[in-house]
């Protein structure tokens, strides 16, 4: 069903795919704020499912709130309208950033108070509600997950509150001391990218008759604080060092987000199950980054 020839990468010129991604399959310039452009790509390639990943990350969004809304919400509206007209399914991810300080901090249930205090979070809650609206009113097959912090060796992090959990592995492989922007003891849910990609595919493949929820499912894999990931790395690099230099904006975001999510509904409704825990991810990250960086 899938494969390089069956996935079309939409991009804007300032963020054109490079390297392996550029060579992996068809790609089209496609600005999410331009509904006609989206429709042209959908028609040209006979697209039946749209993975709408266009968004500013949490820290960047706080500095450019109007642009964050334009991309995240006006863009989503365009995607949903095209999907309604051309009978496409739509996956638009939400995030742990959709929660706020009034949310229960531990094992957050699927349905609970959200009330985020960042434009990133406000836009994610709006994304969930607007996606559900299009499903109920127009029958558009919308589905989503609330992603934890995502960790990957492929793409460098940039502009997110949870980026430290990726940056720390780069420092470890390079033999550098890591300067952590998040305070000791601040737990957040995290997930390795292979699990995140699998979740995005498996949810869209799931039997719709089993889905009580749609936008958006809690999914979880691991929850740790900076000391936890430090200890995991030191099992394989005992000389690795870390110090703290807390960045106020990132810390404020982290303080308003929950420590962990309860993903029972995802497990029950579409058989979600993560494959990577902290140790398994650490082994793979260190191996893959060592090869990538030539260390």
Q: PLM features: residue spans?
A:
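Rossmann-fold cofactor-recognition segment
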Residues: 21-34
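Conserved glycine-rich Rossmann-like NAD(P)H-binding loop of the short-chain dehydrogenase/reductase
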Residues: 2-17
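C-terminal substrate-binding subdomain of Rossmann-fold SDR/epimerase-dehydratase oxidoreductases
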Residues: 181-183, 189-295
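Conserved Rossmann-fold NAD(P)-dependent oxidoreductase catalytic core, especially the SDR/UDP-sugar
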Residues: 52, 77-119
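SDR active-site strand-loop-helix element
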Residues: 10, 50-56, 90-96, 145-147
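NAD(P)-dependent short-chain dehydrogenase/reductase
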Residues: 132-187, 193-198
């Amino acid at each position: 069903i899938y494969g390089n020839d069956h996935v079309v990468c939409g991009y804007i010129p300032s963020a054109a795919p490079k390297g392996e991604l550029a060579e992996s399959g068809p790609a089209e310039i496609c600005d999410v704020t331009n509904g006609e452009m989206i429709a042209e790509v959908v028609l040209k390639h006979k697209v039946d499912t749209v993975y709408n990943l266009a968004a500013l990350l949490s820290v960047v969004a706080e500095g450019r709130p109007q642009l964050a809304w334009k991309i995240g919400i006006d863009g989503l509206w365009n995607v949903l309208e095209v999907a309604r007209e051309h009978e496409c399914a739509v996956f638009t991810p939400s995030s742990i950033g959709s929660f706020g300080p009034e949310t229960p901090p531990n094992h957050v249930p699927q349905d609970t108070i959200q009330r985020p205090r960042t434009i990133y979070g406000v836009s994610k809650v709006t994304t969930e509600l607007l996606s559900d609206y299009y499903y109920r009113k127009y029958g558009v097959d919308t589905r989503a997950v609330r992603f934890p912090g995502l960790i990957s060796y492929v793409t460098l992090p940039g502009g997110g509150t949870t980026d430290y959990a990726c940056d720390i592995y780069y420092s470890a492989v390079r033999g550098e001391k890591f300067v952590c922007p998040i305070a000791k003891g601040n737990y957040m849910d995290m997930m390795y990218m292979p699990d995140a990609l699998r979740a995005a595919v498996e949810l869209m493949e799931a039997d719709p008759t089993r889905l009580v929820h749609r936008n958006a499912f809690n999914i979880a894999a691991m929850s740790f604080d900076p000391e936890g990931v430090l200890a995991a790395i030191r099992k394989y690099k005992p000389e690795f060092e870390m110090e703290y230099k807390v960045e106020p904006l990132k810390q404020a975001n982290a303080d308003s987000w929950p420590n962990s999510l309860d993903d029972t509904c995802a497990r029950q409704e579409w058989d979600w199950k993560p494959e990577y825990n902290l140790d398994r991810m650490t082994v793979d990250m260190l191996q893959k980054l060592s090869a990538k960086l030539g260390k």
